[in-house]
Amino acid sequence: MASKSADIRPGITLACTECKERNYITTKNRRNTPDRLELKKFCSRCGKQTVHRETR
């Protein structure tokens, strides 16, 4: 059985929107951000900063 904090803050993977490579693993708070997370991060495959979107 998962702990209560794991239910509220699940682990998510962020993928580059241009090359689709999954570069980052992080957690998010479901209560504050129920929709998909989008962050501008550096992609080593593209060699530049791109938008990384939450994958399921």
Curated annotation (Swiss-Prot):
Pfam families named among the record's database cross-references: Ribosomal_L33
Could you tell me which InterPro entries the record lists for this protein?
Ribosomal_bL33, Ribosomal_bL33_CS, Ribosomal_bL33_sf, Ribosomal_zn-bd
UniProt-recorded Gene Ontology molecular function terms: structural constituent of ribosome
Q: Name one GO cellular component term.
A: cytoplasm
Q: Which domain of life is it from?
A: Bacteria
Transmembrane ranges, per UniProt, are none
The record, for SUPFAM superfamilies, names: Zn-binding ribosomal proteins
One GO term under biological process is:
translation
* UniProt similarity note: Belongs to the bacterial ribosomal protein bL33 family.
Q: Entry's NCBIfam families?
A: PRK00504.1, PRK00595.1, rpmG_bact
This chain's protein is named Large ribosomal subunit protein bL33
Organism of origin is Bifidobacterium adolescentis (strain ATCC 15703 / DSM 20083 / NCTC 11814 / E194a)
